[in-house]
């Protein structure tokens, strides 16, 4: 079995000044290809530390992806450290120098002398093309390992991993490419409760389960390795969906917003949104996807009671009698939002995101959500975990999306989630 490791470089990563999203993305991407990372090391911008970690980890791994330290500044030391670790000199790669000169010419810029550093590679290095940036990738064999050097810029890293790194390791180590993956998106359940339901199942050989928490969702990944396991994947996926029931809200989608976008795109149906506690989050997540203008008619943030009355037509008496966070108010918000442009659907939210503003009757985390359709209105009052303001807003948006998703599938719109409480009208 090939042993894959990752070395992340940079003082800002080591000190926690930036979150290392590159490492998370790389590990997740490798897992989707059926390849697990055995170890990840983070090291700062000190030459002696880089040399030591290259020499030490190359004794144990078969492949090491090194990320960062390929820029033109004095603290970019990956190439120099690799050369010293192998007892080599740095030499200019003429092909990459030409690439740099052409890149700056195309962008109507004069190339700084410091950028020439990016064409200096260890003598034994094999250049790895980076068509989307100025940092030259390369690979070097040291001890038992191939060290594969990539830039820290996320877009450049992702391009090189997909186009260069994965094909290289598959060919070099004759890896079986027969890997399939299904993803199930869930809300309302924690990892432990999902695992309690899934782990008693007897999985066929070659099929494994993984979990990824990205609140408000938890993603279940079902891996199948080998032809027999791949053939059984649909049956296993169906069984898991049956066991989890309403917890599963999407399949092979990263978020519920993506699921809603996919279902509404080119459907001819239209959506309007009126948001109070979610503050535009529902609308914003849909606008992230190209083509959302084909169905999204408007998104209104009606935060104050006055805006609910004047923009959406909520009856002042409703607010006086029931309050802003109530079923009657949110239903009138949804009806008003739908009526403005005669949309097919309208979502509305009103809640207490915290950390202040809660009462004994309506504590922080209390949210009213409504879905207005041409045939009527669905609504519910839910109680969400109080861990953070952002979590309350994110979960509120997710539940609103799920109500719309269920209506589009002609399923029951109001369902129970384990970790989401519900109040009566």
Curated annotation (Swiss-Prot):
Q: What is the name attached to this protein's record?
A: CinA-like protein
**Any one Pfam family match given in the protein's UniProt record, by short name:** CinA
Which InterPro entries is this protein grouped with?
Answer: CinA, CinA-like_C, CinA_C, Competence-induced_CinA, MoaB/Mog-like_dom_sf, MoaB/Mog_dom
Q: Of which family is this protein a member?
A: Belongs to the CinA family.
